[in-house]
């Protein structure tokens, strides 16, 4: 179960119980018996978020129509997030004295012609810019809401509120964060670093590998790794849900 959903059977059972307590399960059409029960609806949504498989292939697995899977994903993805909203820390929940490593990542989407702001010149593709933070042990600490892909990491970081809440000297970033008061590698002309600067940059980069590993783990939810295919209006709620699931599975 874990390989297809990202959660253990015990975690799924607990998640189903949380949703049952919400009493917000989508109503079935009048006079119709639900095609999938609560447990299977949760599993379907998890499989989609974890693997980003086509709805048709998931429909074949559960012996239902593609439309049923489409409705299930649309209805239950936000419910998963609601059931786990207490698992996701906000900026205000973070310890102001806890050193954090921060980095931005692009979550790819389709190239909608009507949304040129999604194009990232840095990554040469379209998507949403998300800021991720972890502590010095590599524990995930924060995931921001998505911003348009063209947003520079420094601006995106300012928008998260992290710089206002955490002492900037406690934040570690890359060269894109130079000028924000954070600990970053030193920028110099090519081949003009002093030996001391080289040692400093090496020590910073040795720490920053933690956030790269955290982001890689986050993107094992393949819905965040490959082009997002559902309507863009559902993109923010999908990220919110996946963020909650990632925090949940790490703290259960």
Predicted features along the sequence, with ranges:
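Short secondary-structure transition/capping motifs
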Residues: 4, 33-34, 47, 62-65
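A short, structure-level motif marking secondary-structure boundaries and short turns
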Residues: 30, 39-41, 200
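Ser/Thr-centered flexible coil motifs
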Residues: 8, 37, 193-196
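Short, amphipathic alpha-helical "recognition" segments used to contact nucleic acids or chromatin
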Residues: 37-51
């Amino acid at each position: 179960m874990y390989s297809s959903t990202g959660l253990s059977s015990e975690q799924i059972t607990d998640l189903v119980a949380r949703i049952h307590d919400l009493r917000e399960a989508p109503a079935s059409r009048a006079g119709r018996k639900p095609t999938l029960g609560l447990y299977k609806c949760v599993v379907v949504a998890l499989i989609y978020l974890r693997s980003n498989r086509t709805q048709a292939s998931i429909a074949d697995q559960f012996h239902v129509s593609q439309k049923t899977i489409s409705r299930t994903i649309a209805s239950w993805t936000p419910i998963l997030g609601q059931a786990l909203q207490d698992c996701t820390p906000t900026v205000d929940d973070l310890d102001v004295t806890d050193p954090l490593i921060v980095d931005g990542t692009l979550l790819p989407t389709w190239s909608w012609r009507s949304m040129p702001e999604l194009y990232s010149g840095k990554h040469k593709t379209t998507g949403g810019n998300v800021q991720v933070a972890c502590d010095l042990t590599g524990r995930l600490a924060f995931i921001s809401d998505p911003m348009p892909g063209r947003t520079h990491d420094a601006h995106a970081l300012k928008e998260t509120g992290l710089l206002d809440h955490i002492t900037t000297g406690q934040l570690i970033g890359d060269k894109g964060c130079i000028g924000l008061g954070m600990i970053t590698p030193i920028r110099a002309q090519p081949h003009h670093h002093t030996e001391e600067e080289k040692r400093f940059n090496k020590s910073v980069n040795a720490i920053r590998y933690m956030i790269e590993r955290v982001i890689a783990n986050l993107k094992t939810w393949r819905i965040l790794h490959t082009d997002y295919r559902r309507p863009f209006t559902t993109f923010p709620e999908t990220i919110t849900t996946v963020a909650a699931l990632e925090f949940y599975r790490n703290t259960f």
